[in-house]
Each structure stands twice: as C-alpha cells, then as structure tokens.
Amino acid sequence: MQICLMDETGATDGALSVLAARWGLEHDEDNPMALVMTPQHLELRKRDEPKLGGIFVDFVGGAMAHRRKFGGGRGEAVAKAVGIKGDYLPDVVDATAGLGRDAFVLASVGCRVRMLERNPVVAALLDDGLTRGYADADIGGWLQERLQLIHASSLTALTDITPRPQVVYLDPMFPHRQKSALVKKEMRVFQSLVGPDLDADGLLEPARQLATKRVVVKRPDYAPPLADVATPNAIVTKGHRFDIYAGTPLTE
C-alpha cells in the first residue's frame, strides 16, 4: 500500500524502514495521506487538510481513559449488545476494529477481544497504540491479557479463527449522509484512507458461522440492516443501532 511516510523523531535508527517493511507500505511523496512517526506515537495525517490534525490510537490517556474511568462500563450500549451479564463476559472477535474504541471498552469491562483489521495503515496505528498500552503501569497487565490484534481481512480470517468466539462484533464503515453535520474530523481523515466497506455485506454470514452465541452489528440509525437481513433484536441509542443476530452453537 502506498502512503507518504514521515519521521519526525529526529532519530536515525531506520525505524521508519522497519515499520514500512513490517506492514507492506511504500513511500509515496505525493500521497495526500501521511503516516508519521512522532516522538510520542505513530499518527495519520491528511496533508491537504492540515487543520484536521493527526489521528493516533491512545488506550492510555485522552478520551479512552476518560471513557474507561467515567463511562458507563457494563452499562454502555456495546456491552449490553454483546450480552455481558453477571459473570458472563463473552470472548469477542471485533472483525472491523478501526481505531479500537469499542474493542477497548469491552476489554476494559473484562472481555477478551481479538481485533481484526485489514488496512495495513490502520493496523500499524492499532499496533502502536497497543505497544504503548501494554507498557503502561496502570492498564498494561490486563490489556495484554484481553486485547490483541490480528492483521488480516475479515472476509478470509472469519473462516479461520480458532478458538471460536462467543460473539462477533461488526461496525462497518458506512457512507455518511451528505446533509448531516460535518463528519467528525477524525472520520474524515479515516474515510479518506479506507473508504466505505463496500464488501461489508459479505461479513454477516461468515460472522454468524463463527460466533457461537451472537453477532452484533453497529449501524447508523438511518442505515439499512447489514446485507438487508432484518432482525427484531436490537439495542437502540441516540444515532446508532446495535442489531443482534444468532450465531451457530458449538456441536458436541
């Protein structure tokens, strides 16, 4: 994959070349998207809209830390949707990990989550965030136990994952309404990189085959159900819907 690669660390240790080789990235000087190594973290920038700033994954501070400390925890819609109840903390595969926010919420309340991400740039951002998170004195211990990254296409990986999870979580990128308020700056940068999930409909069936209990699909409230498969089971929040589908129980 081609992207502009930049190193702002001041180091001459070749870390950028190692990063490019690991994730299969090629430097393209003219690409409007840039992956930048800063002294603090790895970040994604949209060079033709510098005011949008850089996007990076931070499990330790910022919004994630606030959500972990002061958010709804088990009461969050995503936690309810995957079925957390009492001692039941399902094993989850997040097949469209993105920047890892929902996966982190589930891990923070006790679920083991395997994140799948097919875009190599996004996977690199997630890996950088996990590396810093694993090293953190406060959350590193449980984060290493509960949150892991698999860099693979969900369409292929969903048929190969073992052991099978109880829940598969899907949050495919959906085209935003043109008339809606300006999409959050982060989403604009993100969508410029990955675009809409045009093959997302193909995820539902393999997800249902993989999950032993349920599949949860997060959708904007105006979006049709994934693959046009309606379900009466959903948790509805302001602006979103968590559609719930039955999985395929384990056979004895």
From Swiss-Prot:
GO molecular function: 16S rRNA (guanine(1516)-N(2))-methyltransferase activity
Gene: rsmJ
Protein's UniProt keywords contain Cytoplasm: yes
EC numbers for this chain: 2.1.1.242
Name of the protein in question: Ribosomal RNA small subunit methyltransferase J
Record's catalysed reaction(s): guanosine(1516) in 16S rRNA + S-adenosyl-L-methionine = N(2)-methylguanosine(1516) in 16S rRNA + S-adenosyl-L-homocysteine + H(+)
InterPro entries referenced in this protein's UniProt entry, alphabetically: 16SrRNA_methylTrfase_J, SAM-dependent_MTases_sf
HAMAP family: 16SrRNA_methyltr_J
GO cellular component: cytoplasm
Family membership: Belongs to the methyltransferase superfamily. RsmJ family.
Gene Ontology BP annotations: rRNA base methylation
Annotated residues for binding of S-adenosyl-L-methionine: 101-102, 117-118, 153-154, 171
Native source species: Salmonella typhimurium (strain LT2 / SGSC1412 / ATCC 700720)
Listed Pfam families: SAM_MT (PF04445)
Key words of the record: Cytoplasm, Methyltransferase, rRNA processing, S-adenosyl-L-methionine, Transferase
Physiological role: Specifically methylates the guanosine in position 1516 of 16S rRNA.
Compartments reported by the entry: Cytoplasm
